[in-house]
Amino acid sequence: MLISVPATSANLGPGFDTLGLAVDLRNEIVIKPSKFLSLSTHGEGADNPKIKKNSLFLSIFNENYKRLSGKANNFRFEFTNRIPISRGLGSSSAVIVAALSGAYAMAGVKYNKREILNQALRYEHHPDNITPAVMGGFNVACVEGDRVYSKKRRMPDYLRAVVVVPNRTISTARSRTVLPKMYRKEETVYSLSRAAYMTALFMSESWDLLRIASKDKLHQARRMKMMPELFDVQKLALKQGALMSTLSGSGSTFFNLAYEKDTDRIAQSLRARFPQFRVFVLALDNNGVITK
């Protein structure tokens, strides 16, 4: 059994804990029945003893496999990690979604993606990463009780993500400590109006107005101050033709959306200016989690 989950970029500027989309950079897990527990890890984090334990995956998989009355006692898990870890590209959400999908598949229980998404909410209380990880595409999502309500828009083939991955992390926990407990009404309205406008632009494919819609006053600049180079990343990407340039999740990765014809120029400029950072040019993903 192969489980494949895409990386995701959440918030997209003003859509704090609400908006997200999937990009074609995938973690894969092969699961096979075995006489004893066996783990192998390749790619991102393969040299990190904590990552190699895959504790979060195993905890969620075992809990749900047991809940679903699975019969096998042990499995061999082969992890291929391509999503940078703790960089704001949804690596934790990918683990959660993969573990749940794997538990259902190996237990032989039929399920739909909405069920996986609602189960994922038990482990990740914000829907902005888990929703595109499950569904693919661009998603606007909210939580009511123990359910995620979301709307998906498929992304066109002529757009690409230019993703800048810094050489150090900004932890989600730390990044939340820099946010105020209270916001001024003007800040809230500024970002709320742009999140609504951005959603309309994505749904209508009005890409050339995203530069206005992607501005934010709630979280982005406050978090970027923890890594000031990110202001220069954003400025250069927009100068070179990015449609929008936003902090990915809580960082430290920066997400840039662009027309395919502009991506080489944007990526080359970013690589030349920031040689210490990794730059990926990625297709956008419309499939979400895949089980086969």
Swiss-Prot record:
ATP binds at P84, I85, S86, R87, G88, L89, G90, S91, S92, S93, A94. It catalyses: L-homoserine + ATP = O-phospho-L-homoserine + ADP + H(+). The keyword Cell membrane does not apply. GO terms for biological process: threonine biosynthetic process. Its EC number is 2.7.1.39. HAMAP family: Homoser_kinase. Catalyzes the ATP-dependent phosphorylation of L-homoserine to L-homoserine phosphate. This is Homoserine kinase. It comes from Sulfurovum sp. (strain NBC37-1). The lineage of its organism: Bacteria, Pseudomonadati, Campylobacterota, Epsilonproteobacteria, Campylobacterales. The gene is thrB.
